[in-house]
A protein has these predicted regions:
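Active-site metal-coordination/substrate-binding segment of hydrolases
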Residues: 70-162, 170, 393
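A non-catalytic alpha/beta surface segment that caps or lines the substrate-entry region
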Residues: 21-71, 75-81
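N-terminal capping segment at the start of a domain
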Residues: 2-30, 130, 223, 377-381
Length: 407
């Protein structure tokens, strides 16, 4: 089966992550994630792969045994769910790009504009998969699934090509805090290291990401009727605003870039009696990350001394920087990726990821995992698109990694 046909088949499953179910501990959060996993399981089985596990939580693990000695066992990861930014069914279509704007939906006047996407000039003459402008495409991360299954198909059809053990793993609910990867038992993999395919444009290669933590501060006020509140009412909402005002104003997402960390005040809810404030902490450098956590803890202690034990703070690490587990830029997983790019004449775009991905959770469990491109653009948007040449290149890269690792 052609890789594009595989991808479009996967987009027909509406696997929008369900945040409400996720918060309740339901996995997969959307039952269609399991349906897609079952579909892929059957597909892998039809290729001749015998060692396949599909768990009730939609985690799918398949293994292709090594056909040579002394080659590392390599895992390839993708996620089944799509972002909840848009929830409509995907209506994917292929267009031949000749330049200029791409009409996604003539009836509704929706266009993928060249002025907003100047990188399109690289794809003139290419086939591009787009939507009708009313949904996500789901290249994040179904392009990855297509790439990995296509790679598996190659090795099953070419048994004379030497390779180590290949592990395929698809997980649910990445889009709401790496839930599937956190639930994964890596002991079932038997992998030495791995690659997530969850980057965007062709050439992207990531082996650094945020250290991330969640901060929750609960402010306790004293309620009173406003007609006789003088000297009695303590408004927890105003306490929260005073706390926020103590944060460094320039260290926020909208004022930072590259490896600059931040505090993100992302949610404030409550009333005069009780208010909950949620803050995301992000930093690449581990010592700086710890200093941010200490800063918030010290700030809460000082606040309580001033206002009389009016706040309670909870700090929880969400995920860590993958580079911590890869050790250095000469590690085997990074070298194999760079060599594959070079042999395929793909210019690597190496950059720190101002976000997280499944590899962060998986690396912390003992399987160092970096992040490779899928070829898609404009993730989490109705203007998401996937150049076919980039999708094919993604699969060629991981195929080359497996072959080179066995040499």
């Amino acid at each position: 089966m052609d890789i594009v046909e595989r991808f479009i088949n996967y987009t027909k499953f509406n696997t929008t992550t369900n945040k409400e179910n996720g918060l309740e501990g339901i996995m997969p959060s959307n039952p269609t994630e399991y349906e897609l996993a079952k579909f892929i399981k059957d597909e892998l089985s039809s290729l001749g792969i015998k060692d396949i596990i599909l768990q009730d939580n939609a985690i799918l693990i398949a293994k292709i045994p090594a056909n040579c000695e002394n080659a590392p066992s390599i895992a390839f990861f993708a996620h089944l769910d799509t972002s909840s930014e848009q929830k409509n069914d995907t209506k994917a279509k292929i267009v031949k790009y000749t330049g200029g704007d791409i009409c996604l939906n003539e009836e509704q006047g929706i266009y993928l504009k060249f002025s907003d996407n100047p990188e399109l000039k690289k794809y003139v003459g290419d086939d591009i998969v787009v939507t009708d402008g009313t949904s996500l495409l789901g290249a994040d991360d179904k392009a990855a699934i297509a790439s990995i299954v296509n790679m598996a198909s190659f090795f099953m059809q070419n048994p004379d090509v030497k390779h180590g053990k290949i592990v395929i793993c698809f997980v649910p609910d990445e889009e709401q805090g790496l839930l599937g990867a956190k639930a994964l038992d890596v002991n079932l993999l038997g992998a030495d290291f791995g690659y997530c395919l969850d980057c965007c444009e062709i050439g992207e290669l990531i082996y650094e990401n945020w250290n991330a933590a969640d901060c929750t501060v609960v402010f306790k006020g004293v309620s009173a009727h406003p007609m006789n509140a003088k000297g009695k009412l303590v408004n927890s909402l105003l306490l929260a605003h005073k706390f926020i005002s103590l944060l460094p104003g320039g260290e926020v997402p909208e004022c930072t870039e590259g490896k600059e960390g931040y505090f993100w005040v992302k949610e404030l809810s409550g009333n005069s009696a009780k208010t909950t404030l949620k803050i995301d902490i992000r930093e690449f450098d581990e010592p700086k990350f710890q200093k941010r956590l200490e800063f918030l803890s010290d700030m809460a202690n000082s606040f309580n001394k001033i206002y009389g034990d009016r706040c309670e703070i909870t700090l929880k690490t969400r995920y860590e920087n993958v580079f911590k587990f890869l050790k250095d830029e000469n590690s085997l997983p990074i070298k194999l990726a760079k060599d594959a790019f070079s042999e395929l004449n793909i210019t690597p775009n190496i950059k720190p990821m101002r976000g997280g991905y499944d590899g962060a959770a998986i690396s912390a469990k003992g399987v160092p995992t970096l992040n490779l491109f899928t070829g898609g653009n404009n993730f989490h948007s109705v203007f998401e698109y996937l150049p076919v040449s980039s999708l094919k290149a993604s699969s060629e890269v991981i195929k080359k990694i497996v072959i080179n690792a066995a040499k």
